[in-house]
Amino acid sequence: MDLYFSPLACSLASRITVYAAGAEGSIALRQVDTKTQKTVDGADYRAINAKGMVPALRTPAGDILTENAAILPFLADQFPAANLAPAGGIERSRLAQWLSFIGSELHKTVFTPLLSPKANDGAKTYAREAATSGLAYLDAHLQGRDYLLDRFSVADAYLTAVLNWAQFVGIDLKAWPSVAAYYARVTARPHVARAMQEEMGLFQAA
């Protein structure tokens, strides 16, 4: 399999998942410059993903998957021994619920406008208001919990990648103590720390 990523983008969630699954030998990591739409070997990334965004995953069958909500559960299912996603039932639906919340209420609603130089002041103001409500909801859920579900899952990988952006937009997670404690706890996990350190190095070198 080939995983297409850009350093410190939301594709960090997929790298965390790969490392958590111990799947480095099964998945090639392909870096993408989202500004030039080229991979590091010069290939046209839009020929792989017409949307030009990361992540994208080439499956063993040669299919291309895009979007975190599709890629992360797929990766978890390829390596079931790692227990990174519930196999079915209500817990699988709860995983989908959290992936949807992270993607829509935090990633796109909060951080995309705050990180974009094209977003106007009104959009950024709305994003900060949404951050307050979204992180408050998350904080309430995480009180007394180590992870979003009963154990570390691909939803935690995605949430960690998104919360990592807070440092770049002036959001202090300490305002939400349970979120701050969660972020510190998850980023201390060896596979998460490794993924973040590697991507920070690539980001700084870009």
Regions found by a protein language model. Name each.
Residues 62, 162, 200:
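Flexible loop residues that form catalytic
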Residues 1-125, 129:
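GST-like domain detector, emphasizing the conserved glutathione-binding G-site
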Residues 32-34, 180, 200:
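Conserved beta-strand edge residues that scaffold enzyme active sites
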Residues 197-206:
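Terminal-tail/helix-coil boundary detector
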Residues 75, 98-191, 195:
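GST-like fold's C-terminal all-alpha helical module
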Residues 36-39, 183, 203-204:
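Generic structural signal for helix capping and beta-alpha/helix-loop junctions
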